[in-house]
Amino acid sequence: MTKPIFLNAVLQEKIWGGIKLHTLFNFTLPSDKTGEAWIISAHPNGISTIKSPAEFAGLGLDELYKTHPKLFNEQQLASFPLLIKLLDASDDLSIQVHPDDEYALEHEGEYGKNECWYVVQAEPGAKIVYGHTAMTPEEFAEKIDNEAWSDLFTEVPVKAGDFFDVPSGTIHAIGGGIVILETQQNSDTTYRVYDYNRTDDAGNPRPLHIQQTKDVTTIPHSVPTTNQQVVTTDTGTRTTFVENKFFTVWKYDINGDYSDALSSTYHLVTVLDGKGTLTVDGTQYPIQKADSFILPSGTPTLQINGSVQLIVSQSNQ
């Protein structure tokens, strides 16, 4: 019998964090500087545990992935390929870049990080850093060395409902006043190029990674081509945000009794808003805002009755 796998989130404190992961999603926060909820994660820095079904309760997602491959399309990857987060940027994040797989495996011993963002909430005037102005590696290095930050970084205004594809090599930062859902490769490698001269709890400057940034940044900046596809029925809308070699990400806006055929692989689901009933293999499961679960491989349809907004993803590796 196929059952959905519900997970417990791991909360992460950050210098730029706040309290919106509680006010929006009712998570219990470790402090008022909580920046991230790792809601579907098998990364060693924050492993989600299984809430249900009972036979898996308490297991880490990393262990479940290794010991029950049939749930995950018989995948034999070394580790669970994706990581899903909610981020509350009460303050600006450091301006940063992530390496690709080749560079990260050679220098960090883990995979690179391609990611994408769905903007859940944004205060008026909120912005992200997305890209840079340099046309050559020499110009890029010169502007960094001269700390010509305002000339180098490109700011983009954002609003709730926006989506951004952020491949490895992309200079980026989430600005203060923004809450996002992030779908990413299962990696925690970040290279900071600028951090507003902030210090850690001990008063020490947070480390920067200038040479690594110069090594891995895409020059000139390249905006990925996105061809969002929207399919609407009487009871719901499915929006395909991105489909690449790492993942596919969809948004579902459901209002009623809705069903959509799924591919044979497993799917990662987060409820961003609303509540309803999920039906899997004839059994009904209540779902509500902030729930995250995995539909195991072989689940034929996404079948939901209610009024909910979901972000759904699958690994393409």
In which residue ranges do the predicted regions lie?
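Transition-metal
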Residues: 1-135, 195-224, 249, 317
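Ligand-binding loop in jelly-roll beta-barrel domains
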Residues: 79, 87-92, 101, 122-125, ...
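His/acidic/aromatic-lined binding-pocket segments of jelly-roll/cupin-type domains
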Residues: 84-85, 93, 109, 115-118, ...
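An exposed, glycine/acidic-rich loop-and-rim segment of catalytic or binding clefts
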Residues: 146-152, 163-165, 171-222
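Short acidic-glycine-tyrosine-enriched beta hairpin
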Residues: 152-165, 179, 281-299
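Acidic/His-leaning functional-site neighborhoods
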Residues: 228-291
